[in-house]
Swiss-Prot record:
This is Core-binding factor subunit beta homolog bro-1. Disruption phenotype: RNAi-mediated knockdown increases expression of Runt-related transcription factor rnt-1. One of its GO terms (molecular function) is transcription coactivator activity. GO terms for biological process: negative regulation of DNA-templated transcription; negative regulation of transcription by RNA polymerase II; nematode male tail tip morphogenesis; positive regulation of locomotion involved in locomotory behavior; regulation of transcription by RNA polymerase II; stem cell population maintenance. Signal peptide: none annotated. It is found in: Cytoplasm; Nucleus. Interacts with rnt-1; acts to increase the affinity and specificity of interaction of rnt-1 with DNA. Keywords: Cytoplasm, Nucleus. One of its GO terms (cellular component) is nucleus. Transcriptional cofactor. Required for controlling cell proliferation in the seam cells, a stem cell-like lineage, acting in concert with Runt-related transcription factor 1 rnt-1, perhaps by repressing expression of cyclin-dependent kinase inhibitor cki-1. Represses expression of rnt-1. Regulates male tail development. May play a role in vulval and/or uterine morphogenesis. SUPFAM superfamilies: Core binding factor beta, CBF. Belongs to the CBF-beta family. It comes from the Eukaryota.
């Protein structure tokens, strides 16, 4: 079974969740909800230092462990862009800003347009690049998601 759709653009425009998440929406750092706020702030900072940002999209209830490609801190505001990931069969990036004090922010999805190029192995044969790429999770993270019941 393929992980990605063949028509990324139309799939992005017609997917129920992606049409909502393509606009800025409220997101929260929801890990360690029962811990004291100071501990949650510190854990949030540690995740950002590791180029990770586990997000919960409040409107849809979707939880995503995002790997960061880029982040910049300006006071309490952390602006970021994620590495590409596959969401509902579509390559996307997560872009937004989170507040390190309130642990809330405004975040949106953007369709990621992968470069397609051909590899020339010899003069006579041209092989297209492989469509599937790793989703950016470690074996331990994949095992944890499987234990939680996600069929991947």
């Amino acid at each position: 079974m393929k992980r990605t759709t063949t028509d990324q653009q139309s799939s992005f425009q017609t997917d129920y969740f992606l049409t909502q998440l393509s606009h800025f929406t409220e997101a929260k750092f929801s890990l360690f909800e029962h811990a004291p706020l100071s501990e949650r702030r510190e854990r949030f900072r540690v995740h950002v230092e590791r180029d990770e940002m586990p997000l919960t999209f409040c409107k849809t209830g979707i939880n995503i462990p995002v790997k960061l490609e880029w982040s910049q801190t300006n006071g309490n505001e952390i602006s970021f862009r994620s590495r590409p990931l596959v969401f509902n069969g579509i390559w996307v990036k997560v872009i937004g800003a989170m507040n390190s004090e309130s642990l809330e922010g405004r975040v949106r999805f953007e369709r990621f347009q992968r470069e397609k190029r051909d590899r020339v192995i010899s003069e006579t044969f041209v092989f297209p690049e492989v469509e599937e790429e790793p989703i950016g999770l470690t074996d331990a993270e994949i095992a944890a998601l499987r234990r939680d019941g996600l069929p991947i």
